[in-house]
Amino acid sequence: MCRDKTYTIQSPDCSLTVTIGCGDRIVYSIRSDTSQILKPSPLAVRLVSGECWGRRSRVAGVRRYRIDEVHDAPVYKKRKVEDRCNGIVIDFREGFSLEFRAYDDAVAYRFVARQPGEVLVAGEEARFRFAPGAVAFVPYVRDTPCRHDGLAFGEQFMQSFENTYT
């Protein structure tokens, strides 16, 4: 089992620290250089087959990497976009990986299927246990048509930066 294994990565400027814990569940937390942002929060993916990635999963290996690239962006508001982060990929014996990236101003994660063939996902558990006093900006999708745009629920799915934040 991956009981009590803990992995940590920091953003390139060391202002954010992500801690990933493996035990009976996979949990992660985020800390800035001044305060706790996210308390340990569980992550899991349930497959149609009944398997659950993130529950009693066994670590097979860990790889760390660094990205420091600049990309041309001819149709964006900036000419060049920096891509700087530190990353970790945790491989699990159950045929999946969990990848985290820590940027100077953000954290991202994803589950990656390593097994051949099709993988059907039944659901995902992504909890966000914010520490007291933490501030978050959340884009909401309305479940009824909006007066000003008239979009139905299914037509509202888009990039999060295109939606209303509250």
Question: Which functions belong to the PLM regions below?
Answer:
Residues D4-T166:
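N-terminal accessory beta-strand-rich subdomains and adjacent acidic, glycine-rich linkers
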